[in-house]
Amino acid sequence: MLHEVLYKHLDGILVSRLYTEDQFVDLFSRTIPESNTVIASQLYKSYEENDQRIIEKIDKLIDNKLSLIRVELEREQIEDSISLEEVNKLLHSIDDMLQQHLNQLNIELDNKNTKLLKYAMELSDIEAIDTSMYDNVAKLITDMETNQPSS
């Protein structure tokens, strides 16, 4: 595509692209009436050879530049690939750290739940004692009010 764009541009500049040999010789003869058509023809052929060399050099320059661009793009893709690999490793590392932290939090939560359950059971025992004591005190008060000996 780049070559095509360049060729369109060269079509408006290079003599061999602007004119056929006959057109050039005719134009040359009309512009310089005392000129020889053989000289005009040789001059056109010289232009044609020069134009061809220019086109070849430009093609080569474009191809070289495109090749350099491809190499650079491939290098960047490799760097991006390496970068993606590094990012992937970092993500795995972060995932591992988060998993370890989550495991630690689960262990701490289990420990707290165990302590809370133990505390609840102790409270339950105390509550049973309190209820029993309350019942005994209530009976004692009732007995005292009725003047009955407590048991």
From Swiss-Prot:
Keyword Cell division: yes
Keywords from the UniProt entry: Cell cycle, Cell division, Centromere, Chromosome, Coiled coil, Kinetochore, Meiosis, Mitosis, Nucleus
A single BP term in Gene Ontology: meiotic cell cycle
Coiled coil: 44-64, 102-122
Principal subcellular localisation of the protein: nucleus
Cystine crosslinks: none
Domain of life: Eukaryota
Subcellular localization(s) per the UniProt record: Nucleus; Chromosome, Centromere, Kinetochore
Cellular component aspect of the GO annotation: kinetochore; nucleus
Function (record text): Component of the kinetochore, a multiprotein complex that assembles on centromeric DNA and attaches chromosomes to spindle microtubules, mediating chromosome segregation and sister chromatid segregation during meiosis and mitosis. Component of the inner kinetochore constitutive centromere-associated network (CCAN), which serves as a structural platform for outer kinetochore assembly.
Family: Belongs to the NKP2 family.
Quaternary structure and interacting proteins, as annotated: Component of the inner kinetochore constitutive centromere-associated network (CCAN) (also known as central kinetochore CTF19 complex in yeast). NKP2 interacts directly with OKP1 and AME1.
Protein name, as recorded: Inner kinetochore subunit NKP2
Source organism of this protein record: Kluyveromyces lactis (strain ATCC 8585 / CBS 2359 / DSM 70799 / NBRC 1267 / NRRL Y-1140 / WM37) (Yeast)
